[in-house]
From Swiss-Prot:
Protein's UniProt name: H(+)/Cl(-) exchange transporter 3
GO CC annotations on file: early endosome; early endosome membrane; endosome membrane; Golgi apparatus; late endosome; late endosome membrane; lysosomal membrane; plasma membrane
Short sequence motif named Selectivity filter part_3, residue ranges: 525-529
Chain residues that bind chloride: 239, 527, 613
Lineage of origin: Eukaryota, Metazoa, Chordata, Craniata, Vertebrata
Protein's cellular compartments: Early endosome membrane; Late endosome membrane; Lysosome membrane; Cell membrane
PTMs per UniProt: N-glycosylated.
KW Transit peptide (keyword) present: no
Motif Selectivity filter part_1 boundaries: 238-242
Gene name of this polypeptide: CLCN3
Leader peptide range in chain numbering: none
């Protein structure tokens, strides 16, 4: 009965281990246990026929139905190490899904045997919810810690609280009775460095001393951050999102989500934000959350032994990261679905939602900003928007798309130059230079002196009677009978005009410095604040606004501009709109946000479809097939497969004609990560596929544990050992590590279909046959090289080293 069920599921009785030991260097998504074979027929008798190749697509899982070997017999004595992956290789999604299905079947068959087995079954069923709960708790706690520490260290550049050293500037003045409404940030307990060192609070000497101390602390924080990254955790640099996208697609980067990376990333993210560099903490918080998810997954065997299941946890963790970065749990789930996840089943959607909920709850409990909100720059707008405002919103979208296209090209050009010149060999010096330039230019301008979150808060917040910002410096006519908060109908004061000039300079400064900052060897996120300015005397608004009415909300324009710029850089759409309206609590502004974000995406796509994360993936040469890219060229599988003309023949193994020495020599003389197995050199009939790593481990294990295995022992991949002379050494059976259902296509299959299959199934390689005879192999790297050639790029320059 069991074998019949397995057959209907698409697995033949002896093919389990073949599926659980598939190939190695490229990439694989969920095949759901079904392998598509583009052959004329699966009947062996038809393989010799002249049926038109590539015209009849069949679904098969290979293998032999007549096998007498039971599926579970192959699992009685598994070879240690077989089925694991080397660093910088890609997982086999089909094998991992089969392993998980077999584990689940085994647990279900035993759970009625005893109370202990039932308890183990319940623990296994709930382990997914437990791991995402722990991930959410840790992500929220670390985000709160990072926010509090970054605020304190940012204020440390300007001064210190004498009454309590651990208070930042705002907290220091909370309990002071000497604070006035106009100068709410000044109190006796808070001392600037000029007051402490030279005893002057005002004057040129005070300004110069504060300037020097600001630069000193900025350089100290930047130097400490880059030194910690370089010495202890090189993977802690950058945003982390390009690598996480690659890891979620199945690539193995050992240590990238480890405990050292988590510790150093948490500490250096605080230092990098406090140093005043033009970067944010949003992307690195996703990396931090994924590190938590990876570490906690090792506590549960269901996830620690299965790379595909582990990536479901990482998808949920990335949702928790965005949830605490922006205070947007639903936006986090959509971000994970839209931007980073390669495989996102419905169960992962629910767990991502729960992880984002837990993380947001923990951060709200910590309340790091003292405003009972998840982020510093939470704002609420109650003024409705008007139809004529759609035009300036769309203009903001155009600006965002142009800015995004410019930023991606400029940043990638600089990063490529960094890689190809000597400058890239001195990351510490680069960080120090960028930090020094940023600090020297930023200090004189109050808007560039603020960190990113405070700047966004300043721009998003609407003017009211309690606001002391110079952006709200409107003249107040004491003789008028108007209400005090009727700001839009008052003329602008000197503070507003000076603030606009400072904001213009801040915008230019941020544009230039962000290009050079994103990608340096410190944790660096990307959140581009934009600015928008309205004055009620502008002709475009004057005809529409009634006298005395709150017609335009300047903070709303800043919010839409920020969303448009971030959309132009990342090419996010749905998740970005949800994140921004969760930030502002304004459901009525969804239409302006959608208009601006879609416009920015369209304008950006006109210059190139890649977002900043995809561009960095391509720059680093990771084997990532982006589903957003279109392949429109009319080539065939035979044009891309290896070996090409004038190449040496394909390295293959025969079913039962090779010795242990022959296989070891082939492994030593080649660098391939797997070898097709054929019946014989004459027939070239395909039998299966064996991984280099599995062959090496299996032979070493056999030499240690089995007597009589020597270099001249015959290696047999067939079910039945061929008859050998009596004096021959004991044969070595390696059928258990053979993938007897490798993915195959015919030589006339269009490459458009092959690329689509690689994307949707996450394949790492497929074999090319003609009437059942092996012709060659196509790996994921071959496809990436071919796509680079068709785009007139150098294929050798895009591969990961």
């Amino acid at each position: 009965m069991e074998s019949e069920q397995l057959f209907h599921r698409g697995y033949y009785r002896n093919s389990y281990n073949s599926i659980t030991s598939a190939s190695s260097d490229e990439e694989l998504l969920d095949g759901a246990g079904v392998i598509m074979d583009f052959q004329t027929s699966e009947d062996d008798n038809l393989l010799d026929g002249d049926t038109a190749v590539g015209t009849h697509y069949t679904m098969t899982n290979g293998g032999s139905i007549n096998s007498s070997t039971h599926l579970l017999d192959l699992l009685d004595e598994p070879i240690p190490g077989v089925g694991t992956y080397d660093d910088f290789h890609t997982i086999d999604w089909v094998r991992e899904k089969c392993k998980d299905r077999e584990r689940h079947r085994r647990i279900n068959s035993k759970k009625k045997e005893s109370a202990w087995e039932m308890t183990k079954s319940l623990y296994d069923a709930w382990s997914g919810w437990l791991v995402v709960t722990l991930t959410g708790l840790a992500s929220g706690a670390l985000a709160g810690l990072i926010d509090i520490a970054a605020d304190w260290m940012t204020d440390l550049k300007e001064g210190i609280c004498l009454s309590a050293l651990w208070y930042n500037h705002e907290q220091c003045c909370w309990g002071s009775n000497e604070t006035t409404f106009e100068e709410r940030d000044k109190c006796p307990q808070w001392k600037t460095w000029a007051e402490l060192i030279i005893g002057q609070a005002e004057g040129p000497g005070s300004y110069i001393m504060n300037y020097i101390m600001y630069i000193f602390w900025a350089l100290s924080f930047a130097f400490l951050a880059v030194s910690l990254v370089k010495v202890f955790a090189p993977y802690a640099c950058g945003s982390g999102i390009p690598e996480i996208k690659t890891i979620l697609s199945g690539f193995i980067i050992r240590g990238y989500l480890g405990k050292w990376t988590l510790m150093i990333k948490t500490v250096t993210l605080v230092l990098a934000v406090a140093s005043g560099l033009s970067l944010g903490k949003e992307g690195p918080l996703v990396h931090v959350a994924c590190c938590c998810g990876n570490i906690f997954s090792y506590l549960f065997p269901k996830y620690s032994t299965n790379e595909a299941k582990k990536r479901e946890v990482l998808s949920a963790a990335s949702a928790a990261g965005v949830s605490v970065a922006f205070g947007a749990p639903i936006g986090g789930v959509l971000f994970s679905l839209e931007e980073v996840s390669y495989y996102f089943p419905l169960k992962t959607l629910w767990r991502s939602f729960f992880a984002a909920l837990v993380a947001a709850f923990v951060l709200r409990s910590i309340n790091p900003f003292g405003n009972s909100r998840l982020v510093l720059f939470y704002v609420e707008y109650h003024t409705p928007w008007y139809l004529f405002e759609l035009f300036p919103f769309i203009l903001l979208g155009v600006f965002g798309g142009l800015w995004g296209a410019f930023f991606i090209r400029a940043n990638i050009a600089w990063c490529r130059r960094r890689k190809s010149t000597k400058f890239g060999k001195y990351p510490v010096l680069e960080v120090i230079i960028v930090a020094a330039i940023t600090a020297v230019i930023a200090f004189p301008n109050p808007y560039t002196r603020l960190n990113t979150s405070e700047l966004i808060k300043e721009l998003f917040t609407d003017c009211g009677p309690l606001e002391s910002s110079s952006l709200c410096d409107y003249r107040n006519d004491m003789n008028a009978s108007k209400i005090v908060d009727d700001i839009p109908d008052r003329p602008a004061g000197i503070g507003v005009y000076s603030a606009i000039w400072q904001l213009c300079l801040a915008l230019i400064f941020k544009i230039i410095m962000t290009v050079f900052t994103f990608g340096i060897k410190v944790p660096s996120g990307l959140f581009i604040p934009s600015m928008a300015y309205y004055h009620h005397d502008w002709f475009i608004f004057k005809e529409w606004c009634e006298v005395g009415a709150d017609c335009i909300t300047p903070g709303l324009y800043a919010m839409v501009g920020a969303a448009a710029c971030l959309g132009g850089v990342t090419r996010m759409t749905v998740s970005l709109v949800v994140i921004v309206f969760e930030l502002t609590g304004g459901l009525e502004y969804i239409v302006p946000l959608m208009a601006a974000v879609m416009t920015s995406k369209w304008v950006g796509d006109a210059f190139g479809r890649e977002g900043i994360y995809e561009a960095h993936i391509r720059l680093n040469g990771y084997p990532f097939l982006d589903a957003k890219e279109e392949f429109t060229h009319t080539t065939l599988a035979a044009d891309v497969m290896r070996p090409r003309r004038n190449d040496p023949p394909l390295a293959v193994l025969t079913q039962d004609n090779m010795t242990v020495d022959d296989i070891e020599n082939m492994i030593n003389e080649t660098s391939y990560n797997g070898f097709p197995v054929i019946m014989s050199k004459e027939s070239q009939r395909l039998v299966g596929f064996a991984l280099r790593r599995d062959l090496t481990i299996a032979i070493e294990s056999a030499r240690k544990k089995q007597e009589g295995i020597v270099g001249s022992s015959r290696v047999c991949f067939a079910q039945h050992t061929p008859s050998l002379p009596a004096e021959s050494p004991r044969p070595l059976k390696l059928r258990s590590i053979l993938d007897m259902s490798p993915f195959t296509v015919t030589d006339h299959t269009p490459m458009e279909i092959v690329v689509d299959i690689f994307r949707k199934l996450g394949l790492r390689q497929c074999l090319v046959t003609h009437n059942g005879r092996l012709l060659g192999i196509i790996t994921k790297k071959d496809i990436l090289r071919h796509m680079a050639q068709t785009a007139n790029q150098d294929p050798a320059s895009i591969m990961f080293n």
